[in-house]
Amino acid sequence: MEVRLSNQLPVYPSFVPGIRRAPDRGYSLTPAQTETALKNALRYIPEELHEVLALEFMEELLTRGRIYGYRYRPEGDLKAKPVDQYKGQCLEGKAFQVMIDNNLSFDIALYPYELVTYGETGQVCQNWMQYRLIKQYLEILTNEQTLVIESGHPLGLFRSKPDAPRVIITNSMMVGLFDNQKDWHIAAQMGVANYGQMTAGGWMYIGPQGIVHGTFNTLLNAGRKKLGIPQDQDLRGHLFVSSGLGGMSGAQPKAAVIAGAASIIAEVDSSRIQTRHSQGWVQHVTEDKAEAFRMAQEAMQVREPISIAYHGNIVDLLEFAEAQAIRIDLLSDQTSCHAVYEGGYCPVGISFAERTELLSHDMDRFCLLVDQSLHRHFEVIKKLVACGTYFFDYGNSFMKAIYDAGVKEISRNGIDEKDGFIWPSYVEDIMGPELFDYGYGPFRWVCLSGKHEDLVKTDQAAMDCIDPNRRGQDRDNYNWIRDAETNRLVVGTEARILYQDAEGRLNIALRFNRMVRNGEVGPIMLGRDHHDVSGTDSPFRETSNIYDGSNVMADMAVQCFAGNAARGMSLVALHNGGGVGIGKAINGGFGMVLDGSERVDEILRSAMLWDVMGGVARRSWARNPNAMSTSAAFNESYGDWYHITLPFIPKEDLIQNSIRTSLKRKV
């Protein structure tokens, strides 16, 4: 067995006009670091090709800020094919090729030529040499081997066993002292760090559908909690305003329409607007602020949902609304503030093209403009909130970016960010207590056959597993999957997102595996977003509703990753910085290939409950009431196999009196 790149120099591929390209990420290496970066890239290449490619790679590094190895990119679009059209020694090896190609297809990827799937910087791997080697390894992978991927680099195949993971992935796991944006940028330029976001480097992205259900749930519950909307009604007659139409943020207009709202989403990049409009996820496009609000208000008057893309800057849009005293009910932001100085946030006052030019030629001025824009953004939101708007941070590091720009007023304690910010994140206020604390999270599956009829069958089977009368969340989820086909959510592979709790996920997984066994459908890939009950530790998002001090700890995400590996999930992944940026999160996920076997049934019975309830247990120990009741009920139902440690709750006056008495004695 030999896995290596060919001695033959590939033909340099052509670039399809109109396909988005990543901006220059910046070159800031020392001469010694530059030497190392070039050596690091050339170690993938047979020696006889070094002389040709050394200059080519240096040109990429100097002009793009990264060595992508464009010459090694396959020609054309990398659309996911049916699983049986891939080479492989085991089903898992073929299945993960489906997932990788889906992440990099023109329909899906934000910057396909730079291997960026979504979130401005989230990559499948660092370069096309890695891509080619990973594909080779997956083609020869057997069910007694595990492929290890470290920041995009395929370390190799290692002997394991059938019940072990077939692939183990880590991305950007920086040592603590160096776990910051500055040192990460150096490591990325040198070719040793890959920012995998969540499902980009974890090979589990299913297009913007993957976030639609979560956004739908967030908007509905925000309306119920903050606008007084009854549990059995939707957001008709209410206005939602936000920004971003990228790989994740592009879910906003679709989710808002499904929730019944009128929505205006600002986007500075016309190509992203065009993508969402052509997909039908945005109904109307305008560059006129007054027209955008007029269309929204007309739809609200007749209680019809509408989605409007405003081609322009969100700050301009909000300042117009404030000046005209236009009521905005729900307000958020989904610019890529985890990469705020890398192009993820376009400052007000300049065009998208000017932003890209500044990124390449005047980074200092760009960063200054970002800070000034964030100040203005903060001020206008503050005015709108004072007039009754409910603003929530959508977990994109937006408020942290404002704080880092020098606006200390946004911190809750007025000193630092350790106690959070003056406005809640959507997890803190909505998703945490209403969904995560019960175990509900973004479960998903991909029909590896590529057949739409398989997706229709699995939709029906999943719906049959849900009792809409059990909880309000179950009713919402039942309605979601019932209407999923009508809402035309698929972009890329035949896939579905469905929020479910621990029991729901297990029941659906077992049902699907039985369907595969009976020949009703082809093989299925199960997975989830890392943004889930147990998958991510981040005080700025997933664990922002943890108040016992452990919101800064990453034990849960690491234990979830390790536990899933021990229980035999087909793929396990652990990343740094998903969603909110390097140093601000530890996040993990899994992929589980359903082949219809009883072996898979046993893995599901062991792993699916663990994957969810480990997080519910942690939330329960943090004294979150809904997680405590969920854990207590779980102990009663599964007491023969499981037992979650439950907290005792002291009386508040006892705590206060004890502290007061002790401090008096000390004085």
Task: Please tell me what each predicted stretch does.
Residues 101-106, 112-113, 186, 192-199, ...:
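Catalytic cofactor-binding cores of redox enzymes
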Residues 290-508:
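Core active-site phosphate/anionic-ligand binding loop and the adjoining beta-turn-alpha structural block
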Residues 140-145, 260-261, 327-330, 383-390, ...:
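Structural alpha-beta junctions
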